[in-house]
């Protein structure tokens, strides 16, 4: 059996926490920032966890954690 390869694009976007959940960055903080409120931009700057519905797919893309 060949080794299971990690999807490198997913490895750059997600990181696993100590409890086994996956951290990700929020969207909408790249451009067109002038119309967004400062409070919204601060909230978007914080990382969040991957939803339960998507966690299985992320886990499959990152077999080695």
From Swiss-Prot:
Annotated Gene Ontology cellular component terms = large ribosomal subunit
Q: Which keywords has UniProt assigned to this entry?
A: Ribonucleoprotein, Ribosomal protein
Stretches for region Disordered: 1-65
Please list the coiled coil stretches.
none
GO molecular function (one): structural constituent of ribosome
Family, as annotated: Belongs to the bacterial ribosomal protein bL35 family.
**Bias type Basic residues, positions:** 1-11, 21-43
Name the chain's protein: Large ribosomal subunit protein bL35
**Pfam families annotated for this entry?**
Ribosomal_L35p (PF01632)
A GO biological process of this protein is:
translation
